[in-house]
Structures are given as structure tokens and as C-alpha cells.
């Protein structure tokens, strides 16, 4: 059959059946198989073929000896010292060190152009895909639930949800009498709970929080109601507060007055937290009220 193919016994090539006899006669006369690469070579070129094609040469990168005819494929596919490109910084790195290089290189951060966050290079591609999906969802009007954060109230030291913080702060400020937190560096006394103050108010009208809204309002209770004297011109009009200590009156300087308002103490009768200058005056009223209740009972 004219289209059938047969294998030549010398060069092992497939030849058409009708040309096989002529091909084998020519092949046996002029061609021989190379013992190294098993390729048919002309007899008079065999020596040159073996010296040029099968000569061992050293790889310039790994110094490994390879046949000269396979040097190109070795350098392109097999050599472990061949340069490859880092997927993060696009620099040329040796193949046997690229894993370690990319591990450290991938830990560097880059600014995400979509959300503005700093993201590590090794997860940047996945982050951008997720970030772009989130941006599309936001543009379509679909709200993404955000975890609610808690804020500490500096009046009652309770953790309040962020969406209720300002409402709680306004209410807590009114209940606590707008006492500002202690400054940094000064002793800090934990305030009593607003719930305890509310309970005291319901128990007795007399046992209410008498702390003033402003420090200057404490000046009037310590002035004698019968005194009609006025401070002469040119003198300091600030009224000095007096504190009772061991049964004696002691005048305090303006600086001491200011610091005294930052010190809070509890009333021994009703346990209300009050600034130190008003505590003694309040305790006297509490004692009188307690004694009057005892007589009634």
C-alpha cells in the first residue's frame, strides 16, 4: 500500500513502504547512529559531531558539567542558579533563593488604593478583590454591618455603646452635677454610681446632691449672712473659703481653693460624693436632719 509507513532498520525513522528499500540502501552506506544521542549522522561527520555536540561543558551559573548540545535547555529549565523574577518587587533572584526572598518581600506593606489601608504585599491581590466587591456593594446602597464599639463614660466609668454614648453622657452629666474628671497627676477617687444617687433622692428630699455646678457658687454659703462689709477697692474680690479643722477656722489661698474643689469626699451621713469645701457645711445639715428624724421616731 503506497501510503503505509515502515521503520528503517538503521536510522529508526519511518519511511514510506514503496521507498523503504532505496532509503535503507542509502542509509546503510552513508548514515550511522550516534551512540550518545541516538541520532543519525553522516559517517564522515561522526567525529566532529561527537566532539562538538557531546563535549562536556560547565554551566556558567551552577558550574555543573553538561553536554554541550543540552547546555541551552539546562540553563533555561534545569539550572537552580538561574535568575527568576520576584512576584512582588520584580527583581531578579536566584531560583534556589526565591522562596526565602518572597517570604520577606511579601511582608512589606502597600497602600490599598480602594480603602486607603496598609496591606501586606502577599495578600494585597486578594484584599483588593474583596475591597472592590465591598465598594460595589456600598455603591449599590447595600449597607455593610459594622461591629458596634463601646466608649467609656468618664463620669460613671461604664462602657456605653457608641450609638447611645451622647445620650448617656448628657444624662450622666446632669445626674453627677457636671463634676469634671480629676486632672492628670492628682488623686483620682472613683465616683459613686448614678443609680445610687437617684436612690438617695427618692429616699429623702433632704438627702440630695448639693454639689454646685460651678466652683464659684461655693463662695456664698461661707459668707456670714449678717456681715455687711465690702472689700475695699484695689483688693482681690475673690472670697477665701474656710475649712473647719479641729474646731478652728483656717483661711485658704486662691490656689488652695482651686485644688480643694478637685478633691471629693463622701458624706458620713448620706454617702453623697462632694467637693471638700462644701462637705463640712453639708454634713452639718445632714446631722441636724438625722437628729430631727431620730426625735420624731
From Swiss-Prot:
One of its GO terms (biological process) is apoptotic process. GO terms for cellular component: mitochondrion; nucleus. Transmembrane segments: none annotated. Residues 178-255 are annotated as: Disordered. GO terms for molecular function: zinc ion binding. Keywords: Apoptosis, Cytoplasm, Metal-binding, Mitochondrion, Nucleus, Tumor suppressor, Zinc, Zinc-finger. A zinc finger (TRAF-type) spans 22-99. It comes from the Eukaryota. The keyword Chaperone does not apply. Residues 229-245 have a biased composition (Polar residues). Pfam families: TRAFD1-XIAF1_ZnF (PF21366), XAF1_C (PF18608). InterPro entries: Innate_Immune_Apopt_Reg, TRAFD1-XIAF1_Znf, XAF1_C, XAF1_C_sf, Znf_RING/FYVE/PHD. It is found in: Cytoplasm; Nucleus; Mitochondrion. Residues 202-212 have a biased composition (Basic and acidic residues). Seems to function as a negative regulator of members of the IAP (inhibitor of apoptosis protein) family. Inhibits anti-caspase activity of BIRC4. Induces cleavage and inactivation of BIRC4 independent of caspase activation. Mediates TNF-alpha-induced apoptosis and is involved in apoptosis in trophoblast cells. May inhibit BIRC4 indirectly by activating the mitochondrial apoptosis pathway. After translocation to mitochondria, promotes translocation of BAX to mitochondria and cytochrome c release from mitochondria. Interacts with BIRC1, BIRC2, BIRC3, BIRC4, BIRC7 and BIRC8. Part of an complex consisting of BIRC4, XAF1 and BIRC5; the complex formation requires IFN-beta stimulation. Interacts with RNF114, the interaction increases XAF1 stability and proapoptotic effects, and may regulate IFN signaling. PANTHER family: TRAF-TYPE ZINC FINGER PROTEIN-RELATED, XIAP-ASSOCIATED FACTOR 1. This is XIAP-associated factor 1. It comes from Bos taurus (Bovine). The gene is XAF1.
